[in-house]
């Protein structure tokens, strides 16, 4: 989800409460495309950047796994990412920011009840202490916020704010400056409906789970960032499994949305090239966007990339 409203890192529950058809022959896209655009395919799947082609597409599109934070390390991506972003006709993000009503969005983050009514005294003190120590915010001042969104404040503090915008929003700003068309895969209301399908108590459990991690907050943040920039989707899956908690959460926030994303990507204009930025947690797995697109008849190939150190 978009970082300002959820900041669910990798779309996982803890520090994230704030990611089989393959054409046997060459795709319909001429080989000249990859030569012209200056990239080569990766020997393995340790990459966040993927080419989507075939199945009637006149131009290739590109799928890029993002992480919704402002830490400068995740902005040190390969120049080919910038090149393909510039090449694409359309930038697609999870939610088109132009379609969000800020007042409505703010209301969606609030609940009628008070978080005090869901926490024991010990839980309240623990969460209040953590929030104040790491963000300077007292729980009392945000007690009417849905617990799911309290993680956004926690995540922003843990992952650092070197850059002005989170990664996906930075691409959005660049697209707007260059008058590139921007679209969204999902609607804001769809993501909020997913949040509201989790009970307040379940949301609180996700917040409290993150406080009980054996790693320090700094170690948690470093581990997540390092896993992300490694581009290793298998390691990403392992990290997700460490935190994903209840199967209900994974189904609602990852699997169901993966299917919706793949369906809508498949409906894109075949004459246009899209640069599609979605949370990295949506890429891997049997029901990840990559495999779902392959099942729809697209050729989805890993592009060789690296991060600058």
Report residues per predicted region.
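Signal peptide processing junction and immediate N-terminal pro/mature segment
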Residues: 28-34
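Structured, acidic catalytic/metal-binding patches in enzyme active sites
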Residues: 34-38, 48-246
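C-terminal motif of bacterial Sec signal peptides marking the signal peptidase cleavage site
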Residues: 23-24
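Bacterial N-terminal signal peptides that target proteins for export
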Residues: 2-15
